[in-house]
């Protein structure tokens, strides 16, 4: 469900930088000066799986201090009136000012859900300002760096909390319907992994050019900029994530890929390629990143880069290790490749397309419940406290990833081992290798129990 957010706050707190980051284009000047523009800027924004309209109240930045109760307020109230929720920005390095407090008063009186954002929180310089923001009475501030892209996952959570109805997953996933209506649209792909695994080399080989290594200019989001490429007739939208920064920034700031970087990259992708160095596969960080992909519900492909440096025996061991360490995506595709020479890229794109198709799988209710009947007949659920749990039926409300609802008499009594049995059976019966499978339990009573009472 679409919604509108308005970015409000005093001048120079980073509203335009955040606007550019969420929109993914330089639609707003980052260092606005009075007179540059007097119009509110609007754009279509995306954060993870959230798509929404964003309004940058640029008119606020052109107002003089003595017009705070006049023209500034009129611009603010127009933006607030059109918005479903507000992103109220302060500068964490400066702390609160009288202007901040005046805008906070407007936000409170509006009655609109307000997300307090302590921008410029990178480093220790913003800690005091972020703590001071509690005085505004707008709840806990979200520490953020719009310039560096830090804290976007926390902002995502805050938006979902402020607008639960608009951000809740729909029974019929709108994104799934869009994909089914246009099966030829590009697959959204992010390539992530440890430093020196060869991400930049691989992506530039895939794109056929090196231009992204010079990076987007400061202020334009690195998380949502994307480039479309066609490889052997298959359209891909490759996202410019943390691995595509300037060489200097890679050396200075990306000495290791943090969980936050991986999470931000995933939220803009449908298929995530976790790239591993064949000479040092499945280190702890590889597993942590792959686990994040699975928990986010994205389709996963493992890229075995620099595979020309090891023998075939090492690849066989990798298959065993993948199924051992990542049982929740058993059968995940593993592609040996070389980003340097381009060997294996055809297989990689084929694996991306195949995993994407599995990720979009929908299973009709009849075969789904035939499987359930066979599974429960051959291995009934265990009795708990002398009472057996009654498994009634199963449905699939959504795909991307395949998600199922199991109706039973006592959901809390079903052990995890039995849920794994059902999930593994689904994977095998309906050919769902390498993608997360989500299984939700719901209680379903006997509809005729009270019929004669």
From Swiss-Prot:
GO BP terms in the entry: ribosome biogenesis
Coiled-coil annotated spans: none
CDD domains, per the entry: EngA1, EngA2
Pfam families referenced in this protein's UniProt entry, alphabetically: KH_dom-like, MMR_HSR1
Record key words, sorted: GTP-binding, Nucleotide-binding, Repeat, Ribosome biogenesis
Residues covered by the KH-like domain: 361-445
InterPro entries xrefs: G_ENGA, GTP-bd, GTPase_Der, KH_dom-like, KH_dom-like_a/b, P-loop_NTPase, Small_GTP-bd
Transmembrane segments: none
Function as written in the Swiss-Prot or TrEMBL entry: GTPase that plays an essential role in the late steps of ribosome biogenesis.
The protein's name: GTPase Der
Lineage of origin: Bacteria, Pseudomonadati, Pseudomonadota, Alphaproteobacteria, Hyphomicrobiales
Gene designation per UniProt: der
């Amino acid at each position: 469900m679409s919604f509108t957010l308005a970015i409000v706050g005093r001048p120079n707190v980073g509203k335009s930088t955040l606007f550019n980051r969420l929109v993914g284009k330089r639609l707003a000047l980052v260092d606005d000066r009075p007179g540059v523009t007097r119009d509110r800027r609007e754009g279509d924004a995306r954060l993870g799986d959230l798509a929404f309209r964003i309004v940058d109240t640029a008119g606020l930045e052109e107002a003089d201090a003595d017009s705070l109760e006049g023209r500034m307020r009129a611009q603010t109230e127009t933006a607030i009136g059109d918005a479903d929720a507000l992103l109220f920005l302060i500068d964490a390095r400066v702390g609160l000012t009288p202007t901040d407090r005046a805008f906070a008063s407007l936000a409170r009186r509006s009655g609109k859900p307000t997300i307090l954002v302590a921008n410029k929180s990178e480093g220790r310089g913003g800690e005091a300002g972020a703590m001071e923001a509690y005085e505004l009475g707008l709840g806990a501030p979200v520490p953020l760096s719009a310039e560096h892209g830090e804290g976007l996952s926390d902002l995502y959570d805050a938006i979902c909390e402020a607008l639960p109805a608009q951000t809740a997953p729909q029974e019929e996933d709108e994104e799934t319907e869009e994909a089914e209506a246009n099966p030829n649209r590009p697959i959204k792909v992010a390539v992530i992994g440890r430093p020196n695994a060869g991400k930049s080399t691989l992506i530039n080989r895939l794109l056929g050019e090196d231009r992204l290594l010079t990076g987007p200019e400061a202020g334009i989001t690195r998380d949502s900029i994307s480039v479309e490429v066609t490889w052997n007739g298959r359209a891909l939208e490759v996202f410019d994530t943390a691995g595509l920064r300037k060489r200097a920034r890679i050396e200075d700031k990306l000495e290791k890929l943090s969980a936050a970087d991986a999470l931000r990259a995933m939220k803009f992708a449908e298929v995530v390629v976790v790239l591993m160095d064949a000479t040092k596969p499945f280190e702890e960080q590889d597993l942590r990143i792959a686990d994040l992909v699975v928990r986010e519900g994205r389709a996963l492909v493992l890229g075995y880069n620099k595979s020309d440096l090891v023998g075939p025996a090492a690849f066989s061991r990798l298959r065993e290790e993948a199924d051992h360490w990542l049982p929740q995506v058993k059968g995940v595709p593993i592609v040996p490749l070389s980003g340097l020479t381009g060997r294996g890229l055809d297989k990689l794109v084929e694996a991306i397309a195949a995993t994407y198709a599995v990720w979009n799988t929908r299973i009709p209710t009849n075969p789904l419940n035939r499987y359930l009947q066979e599974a429960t007949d051959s291995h009934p659920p265990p009795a708990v406290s002398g009472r057996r749990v009654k498994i009634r039926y199963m449905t699939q409300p959504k795909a991307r990833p395949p998600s199922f609802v199991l109706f039973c008499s006592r959901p809390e009594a079903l052990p995890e081992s039995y849920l794994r049995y059902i999930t593994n059976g689904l994977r095998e019966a309906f050919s769902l290798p390498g993608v997360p499978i989500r299984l939700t339990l719901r209680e379903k009573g006997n509809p005729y129990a009270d019929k004669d009472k």
